Amino acid sequence: MYFGCIKKIPDILYLNQKGNRSQNINKNYTYTIKGKKVKYILDSAIIRSQNQNHYSCYITGNKKEYAFDGASFSYLLPFKWKDKINSNDTWKFEDTFQEVFDFKLCDVTYFYYRNEKKN
């Protein structure tokens, strides 16, 4: 990743992944930016279903992992999603049976937050 033209170290990074990937996604990344080591930690993700008709999101709150699917009648569901990002697991939500999700086959945007204090 290139950070040469930035004026300020970013607080958030995002990583877009197109479906059908073979390489692993890291839960943490460390970069040297402006001479300083900066660590980013995976916080959330948005995933598009295999048939590309629906999105769902995955968040971390108080160190717990959750899923949210707008078409479901539930709000935040406890869901251990970080363990699935490099697996071939597929899943469906209760109210959207036709939508199948998979971190390796679907389009995903991952969001990372900066773990160091600001300058």
Feature roles, as predicted:
Residues 41-119:
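Conserved catalytic-core surface of thiol
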Residues 1-37:
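Core regions of eukaryotic protease modules
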